[in-house]
């Protein structure tokens, strides 16, 4: 159920001029072939692991953040509560479409302008398109968020950068010194926690966080639903068009 919907966007990419069409079509055909007889990777029966780490999720009672500027320096929310936040980045490959819907639900609860500078960058153009169709981008615009071109954006720090010496909450993968901005202190957090921090201008307390999350929890099925490309007319039509492009008529070569 996770593989089948993702054949469609590969052909959508072909229809929209992405390179290389033959490579994309080969991948699509390989996925379709696998779907006729799906098999999963399994470890050898006698496999020996270097290390086995067991994490009891029942012991995690509150959100976790990676602190400036080391992704391994992890603390609980209560340990960093109240830290003033200047900028917030919600984006990069660590996010999916549900995270942006959740962030929008947080922003809808804010009266007036945000006390922070908020950056938003969906990971793909497909996410951007669907979020626009759903009206989520209108919510970002009303809140004053800066919407970036889909992709890495602040995560790489080469398309744009936060203000020097600012304190930031980010959903990106790393927070090494000077990566997002010169002298910036960067916390790594979930999209939901990042959105609440943007709304408050600080890292929230647990009660503040739970207040915002209570609204999201009631709509979780709708917010976090997958983007099933094979059920969206525009993507289906583009996929069908791509199948007729001569460059995608791939033949296996012995």
Predicted regions and their residues:
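Fe-S-dependent hydro-lyases/dehydratases of central metabolism
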Residues: 1-254
